Amino acid sequence: MISSADSLATRAGLEVLKNGGNAVDAAIATSATMAVVAPHLCGMGGDLFALVHINGEVHSLNAAGRAGSGVNANQMRADGFTKMPMLNNFNSVTVPGCVAGWVSLHERFGTL
């Protein structure tokens, strides 16, 4: 079974299953299609979190973006920050993790 907010993305996932892919392959195809047809709902510029249940075991993936290479926690503290600024500061912008998450899921659990 495949479910998404867009029929094209759902169809993409179903095609992957019909062609021998597993649930992880289908989820990646569905998510990638959503990034094209509905980027306001599921874009490649975001993060990815997954729970995968295989052979009685649950695996988790946190593909949240990391801080940029120029961000230094000690310098931020020295600048007077006591928590991460959420607005109007480049330090709060992360590197997107979605595509790296697809790669990690595919390498570990994909079959196609």
Pin down the residues of each PLM region:
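Noncatalytic scaffold domains of N-terminal-nucleophile
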Residues: M1-R11, E15, A23-L112
